[in-house]
């Protein structure tokens, strides 16, 4: 039951971060492309790579893994919003933007998970 509290606390932080980052990206770039979702997915993927690698090279407590990996990063990143935004772009006739959104989200996020892991592995 203790881990549930860590997930909830991490989730509340991740959700607020996602909201604030999305607002900032909307102010900076406008609403023509879903940069907020892209940024939180890239950031969350990088941090997931770091957390995964830290778990490989050191002892991370189950509470830390629950707090950061499941709670904070689970709430920060968003596959459902990404999917909905991609579909909306297609429905609006913005096929190039929709494809770009899918390719960049998936490709960059996989790459930054790798970068996060390599950052940790190069230090240990």
Swiss-Prot record:
Main localisation: membrane
GO molecular function, one term: metal ion binding
Keyword Mitochondrion: no
Regulation: Na(+) is not transported, but it plays an essential structural role and its presence is essential for fluoride channel function.
Residues reported in the UniProt entry to bind Na(+): 74, 77
GO CC annotation, single: plasma membrane
Domain of life: Bacteria
An individual GO BP term: cellular detoxification of fluoride
Position of the signal peptide: none
UniProt KW keywords: Cell inner membrane, Cell membrane, Ion channel, Ion transport, Membrane, Metal-binding, Sodium, Transmembrane, Transmembrane helix, Transport
Topology within the bilayer: Multi-pass membrane protein
Record field: transmembrane: 4-24, 35-55, 62-82, 95-115
Compartments, record wording: Cell inner membrane
Catalyzed reactions per annotation: fluoride(in) = fluoride(out)
Described purpose of this protein according to its UniProt entry: Fluoride-specific ion channel. Important for reducing fluoride concentration in the cell, thus reducing its toxicity.
Family the entry assigns: Belongs to the fluoride channel Fluc/FEX (TC 1.A.43) family.
Name of the protein in its database record: Fluoride-specific ion channel FluC
């Amino acid at each position: 039951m203790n881990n549930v509290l860590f997930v909830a606390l991490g989730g509340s932080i991740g959700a607020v971060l996602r909201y604030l980052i999305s607002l900032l990206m909307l102010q900076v770039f406008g609403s023509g492309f879903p940069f907020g979702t892209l940024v939180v997915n890239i950031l969350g993927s990088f941090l997931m790579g770091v957390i995964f690698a830290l778990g490989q090279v050191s002892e991370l407590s189950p509470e830390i893994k629950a707090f950061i990996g499941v709670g904070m990063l689970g709430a920060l990143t968003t596959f459902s919003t990404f999917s909905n935004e991609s579909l909306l772009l297609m429905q609006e006739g913005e096929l190039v933007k929709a494809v770009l959104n899918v390719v960049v989200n998936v490709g960059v996020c996989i790459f930054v998970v790798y970068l996060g892991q390599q950052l940790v592995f190069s230090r240990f």
